Design a protein with these regions (language model features):
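A solvent-exposed, acidic/Ser-Thr-rich amphipathic alpha-helical stretch
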Residues: 7, 25-77
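Hydrophobic pocket/interface hotspot
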Residues: 13-16, 27-28, 35, 47, ...
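Short, aromatic-enriched amphipathic alpha-helices that serve as compact interaction elements
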Residues: 4-22, 30
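A beta-strand edge to alpha-helix "cap/lid" segment located at domain peripheries
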Residues: 1-5, 21, 56-144
Length: 144
């Protein structure tokens, strides 16, 4: 285990969340040119520009998103950093807050080549605001 390498990669993932939440193009500098991106309902994208292709799916509906930086859990393992956490935001006028509403919990798997991200797989329910009522088979009166 190389703790300095792990610390550097965790720092890069923290920077990813900060830049992504701000919608800053500099987020692309954290990725390899041929990076692989996966997001539910988007599928796979290849090349770092595919990150913005994925984000375009939220054009006109995502008012803001903020990851809860102080509650992120980082798990370094070899070339990977797994991050579990919550986010909050507003989509089409409706808010969500991970841990308080059905949407907003996520797990991201970052793969690194050197100090740059070569792969990002995002695992979450993209129904952030809980509008997919027919599939709430266990009811909405749950602890989130």
């Amino acid at each position: 285990m190389d703790s300095s390498r792990d610390d550097k990669r965790i720092q890069v993932t923290r920077e990813y969340f900060r830049l992504a939440d701000q919608g800053r193009r500099e987020v692309l500098d954290l990725f390899h040119d041929e990076a692989e991106i996966y997001f539910p309902k988007f599928g796979f994208g290849f090349g770092r520009q595919s990150l913005f292709e994925m984000v375009k799916g939220f054009d006109g509906v995502l008012e803001f998103i903020r990851h809860d930086y102080d509650k992120l859990t980082f798990i370094p393992a070899g070339d990977y950093v797994v991050v579990e956490g919550t986010s909050r935001g507003r989509l089409s006028g409706k808010t969500w807050a991970g841990g308080e509403t059905p949407g907003g919990r996520f797990c991201n798997v970052f793969k690194f080549h050197g100090d740059r991200i070569s792969s990002l797989h995002v695992y979450l329910d993209p129904d952030y605001t809980g509008e997919d009522i027919p599939r709430f088979r266990w009811g909405a009166d749950r602890k989130w």
